[in-house]
């Protein structure tokens, strides 16, 4: 599958290539010392939505493997919201879909709907999080630290 054929240059996401700078920018307006921020980050007690951070880290890992970044959004019927799959990577004539979650696996409606909608084009679908490896139906649950091995 050629993902470059479906590029939409009017829709894009921006990621920072320096994750340390990204974390600093996330908390630049808060009166907390740098060491306190990183201690809370490491202990998973940071008062923030870390989804952006984990998605940024994932983007960094994927580009470091030499891959281009692709994602997919589509309208959720009967709603003003959209579904979004964080990353798509081609594998031969199929694609691998990745959904990144900062905490547990929680809700993952987008990747499930993507798998239902595009099942014949999908090789593997991954939910990347801090949790242990596992499987839920056709969805592979993988810990965040394994992402570089899944995209090479």
Please name every model-derived segment.
Residues 83, 107-111:
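Residues at alpha-helix caps and immediate loop-helix transition turns in enzyme cores, especially N-
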Residues 1-84, 89:
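Accessory nucleic acid-recognition modules appended to NTPase machines
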Residues 15, 98, 126-128:
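Hydrophobic/aromatic beta-strand patches that form the interior of the parallel beta-sheet core
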Residues 130-152:
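Domain-level recognition of nuclease-like catalytic cores that cleave nucleotide substrates
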Residues 89-97:
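Active-site beta-strand-loop-beta-strand hairpin of nuclease catalytic cores
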Residues 68, 123-124:
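Residues at the starts of beta-strands that form the adenosine-phosphate
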Residues 114-123:
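Arginine/glycine-rich "motif VI" loop of SF2 helicases in the C-terminal RecA-like domain
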Residues 100-108:
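Short beta-strand-loop-alpha-helix junction that forms the active-site gateway
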């Amino acid at each position: 599958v050629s993902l470059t054929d479906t590029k939409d240059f009017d829709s894009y996401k921006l990621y920072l290539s320096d994750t340390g700078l990204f974390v600093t920018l996330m908390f630049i307006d808060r009166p907390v010392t740098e060491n306190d921020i990183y201690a809370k980050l490491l202990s998973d007690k940071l008062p923030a939505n870390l989804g952006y951070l984990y998605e940024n880290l994932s983007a960094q890992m994927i580009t470091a493997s030499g891959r281009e970044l692709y994602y997919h959004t589509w309208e959720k019927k009967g709603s003003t919201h959209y579904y979004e799959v964080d990353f798509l990577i081609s594998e031969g004539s199929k694609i691998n879909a990745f959904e990144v979650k900062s905490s547990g696996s929680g809700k993952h409606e987008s990747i499930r709907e993507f798998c239902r909608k595009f099942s014949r084009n999908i090789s593997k679908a991954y939910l990347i999080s801090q949790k242990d490896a596992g499987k839920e139906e056709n969805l592979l649950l993988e810990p965040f630290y394994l992402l570089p091995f899944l995209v090479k």
